[in-house]
Amino acid sequence: MQGCSRYAELHCTTNFSFLQGGSHPEELVSQAASLGYAALAITDRVSLSGVVRAHAAAKEVGIHLVIGAVVEPIDAAPLVLWATNKKGYQNLCRLLTSGLLKQGCSKKSKEIDESDVRDHDPRCLLTADEVADHTDGLL
């Protein structure tokens, strides 16, 4: 099978997204590499739990890993967010943690407002609406 060397899957959930993703992060990275993907984004639901395993697997097979998450603001539709650099990763961790602290660690709902997302530096944290203008930062 011919690989898709310029293709990057930018929204992929692992088995850490309960009832949404079924594969282990390592399996997803391995499959993406075997298909010849340029990159793979792990975007679990309100969690970065699959990122460490995915990072180790991506390093092993030589595929670029994009770190992200799906957040569910209480006043807006779900958003896919990607970290474009180390600061973006820190922002994403902070955003997810603040949602947990507001809610009290319930996995059912996170108390993240759309304004919480907007408060972060857009050069570090991208939403799906912004990705077309910033793909160089991701890939």
Regions found by a protein language model. Give the residues of each.
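Phosphodiester-processing cores and adjacent nucleic acid-binding clamps
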Residues: 1-139
